[in-house]
Curated annotation (Swiss-Prot):
Signal peptide: none annotated. This is NH(3)-dependent NAD(+) synthetase. The keyword Ion transport does not apply. Deamido-NAD(+) binds at R112. GO terms for cellular component: cytoplasm. Belongs to the NAD synthetase family. Mg(2+) binds at D37, E137. Its EC number is 6.3.1.5. Pathway: Cofactor biosynthesis; NAD(+) biosynthesis; NAD(+) from deamido-NAD(+) (ammonia route): step 1/1. Catalyzes the ATP-dependent amidation of deamido-NAD to form NAD. Uses ammonia as a nitrogen source. It comes from the Bacteria. Keywords: ATP-binding, Ligase, Magnesium, Metal-binding, NAD, Nucleotide-binding. It is an enzyme of class 6 (ligase).
């Protein structure tokens, strides 16, 4: 198993280097939240680009203090250059103007603010924006369109969350980050498990079977329950996948009009 993950690390580092070169970039930038996914991406980027891999820390007015602490600790441990841009003043303005905004609206606004800061830094420093969303999030649509899902390339987008955990172990990610509950940190008390209803240890095996069995076919509830999955779990996951499938699609462009 260790040998497989060492090969994966080499593969992902090679991906980052080649894809950046292909696009004409020598520097990269990514958002570092203090969570697992961005920590893994940060360490991979540091291995490839050294001082040319830059992390942006972008806490909001509701970010947990330990998120910033964990991000700073990672930067110190792995010698990662970083800049902090607080988005708190901006999300406070949004909250004051839209007092009835739901937590989801506020969270999406913060995610898109961070995207704006990343792409502004990208332009200023001639750096390529690196994504940090894992495959579980992408399949479930558990992310903000044109927010945390926005990037130029993504080294972990084909790794399920449970696989990211395993990779993080071999990258020597600090235990504090490894052991804390996954959270987008978009509002107080948020956690992935609360939002999704299940831990990734339960969700990922189902997602893998869905991918293996229904790549080009409609997903069938009965097939999955016959494999032993709980019916409510399967219904919830299928509903989320179908509802959010558009987030993985490129914008649909009308075909060129040719008058007869």
């Amino acid at each position: 198993m260790q040998k497989d993950y060492q090969k994966l690390i080499v593969y992902l580092c090679d991906f980052l280097e080649k894809e950046a070169q292909k696009r004409g970039f020598k520097k990269v930038v990514y958002g570092l939240s203090g969570g697992l996914d961005s920590a893994v991406v940060g360490v991979l980027c540091q291995k490839v680009f050294k001082e040319n891999a830059h992390a942006l820390l972008m806490p909001s007015s509701v970010s947990m203090p330990e998120s910033k602490t964990d991000a700073l600790n990672l930067c110190e441990t792995f010698s990662i250059p970083y800049t902090e841009y607080s988005i708190a003043p901006y999300d406070k303005i949004f909250g004051s103007h839209f007092k009835d905004a739901s937590l989801t609206r506020k969270g999406n606004f913060c995610a898109r603010l961070r995207m704006a800061f990343l792409y502004d830094y990208s332009l200023k420093s001639d750096s390529l924006v690196i994504g940090t969303s894992n495959k579980s999030e992408r399949i479930l649509g558990y992310g903000t369109l044109f927010g945390d899902l926005a990037c130029a390339i993504n080294p972990i987008g084909e790794l399920f969350k449970t696989e990211v955990y395993e990779l993080a172990y071999y990258l020597n990610i600090p235990k504090k980050i490894l052991n804390k509950p996954p959270s987008a940190d978009l509002f107080v008390g948020q956690s992935d498990e609360k939002d999704l209803g299940y831990p990734y240890s339960v969700i990922d095996p189902l997602l893998k079977d869905i991918e293996a069995l229904f790549q080009t076919k409609p997903i069938h509830l009965e097939t999955l329950t016959q494999l032993g999955y709980d019916e409510i779990l399967v219904k919830n996951i299928i509903s989320r996948i179908q509802k959010n499938a558009f987030k993985l699609e490129s914008p649909t462009i009308a075909k060129r009009f040719n008058p007869k």
